[in-house]
Amino acid sequence: MSKISLDALNVRNALIEKGIETPMIDPTQAKNERRESIAKHMHEVMKLIGLDLRDDSLEETPNRLAKMFIDEIFSGMDYANFPKMTKIKNQMKVSEMVQVNDITLTSTCEHHFVTIDGKVCVAYYPKDWVIGLSKINRIVSFFAQRPQVQERLTEQLLTAFQTILETDDVAVYVKATHFCVKARGIRDTNSYTVTYAYGGVFLEDRDTRKEFLATVQK
């Protein structure tokens, strides 16, 4: 079993404490066994749909789906995959807002297992620690790689960054298109969903919040 880092454990415990962890169970099978089982079941699902898996274009699709689920689009369900964090002591006494805009978001709607496509913006006021900018993108990617609802994802990101950075002063903005709306049902190709989560000074001070929103809503 892969080792889970202390940062990952702290984040997971914080999410559980707040009641915003993704509904998950601990798997009892090894990854290769789970891939084999998923492939077997997907083979039957595809047959029930009416597809002929003897066709060379389709015969490996169950295996491809199993690998994609376990190793790629749902890899964020395994905290062993949580990004390795190197926190840097804030020796320069950075006190201004640190903000990363337009982080690519590609996730999966947990209701229909179709794509959520959008952008994330994260900002924080450093206290004792800062982290490398790419780590912000990696944390967003980790939580995107699991079945999600946008509202919970936004809150998970807020709590994760607050936990790692050891500060409440964090803001998260998510703007996304949901293919469960775009590609099925109402088939609305124009609408998008925006969610926000604020902590600390972003929650308490309107001007700070406005400063953050002024850049993300351009």
UniProtKB/Swiss-Prot annotation:
CDD domains: GTP_cyclohydro1. SUPFAM superfamilies: Tetrahydrobiopterin biosynthesis enzymes-like. It comes from the Bacteria. One of its GO terms (molecular function) is GTP cyclohydrolase I activity. Keywords: GTP-binding, Hydrolase, Metal-binding, Nucleotide-binding, One-carbon metabolism, Zinc. GO terms for biological process: one-carbon metabolic process; tetrahydrobiopterin biosynthetic process; tetrahydrofolate biosynthetic process. It is an enzyme of class 3 (hydrolase). Zn(2+) binds at residues 109, 112, 180. It holds the Pfam family GTP_cyclohydroI. It catalyses: GTP + H2O = 7,8-dihydroneopterin 3'-triphosphate + formate + H(+). Pathway: Cofactor biosynthesis; 7,8-dihydroneopterin triphosphate biosynthesis; 7,8-dihydroneopterin triphosphate from GTP: step 1/1. InterPro entries: GTP-CH-I_C/QueF, GTP-CH-I_N, GTP_CycHdrlase_I, GTP_CycHdrlase_I_CS, GTP_CycHdrlase_I_dom. One of its GO terms (cellular component) is cytoplasm. Its EC number is 3.5.4.16. NCBIfam families: folE (TIGR00063), PRK09347.1-1 (NF006824), PRK09347.1-3 (NF006826). Toroid-shaped homodecamer, composed of two pentamers of five dimers. HAMAP family: FolE. Belongs to the GTP cyclohydrolase I family. This is GTP cyclohydrolase 1. It comes from Haemophilus influenzae (strain PittGG). The lineage of its organism: Bacteria, Pseudomonadati, Pseudomonadota, Gammaproteobacteria, Pasteurellales. The gene is folE.
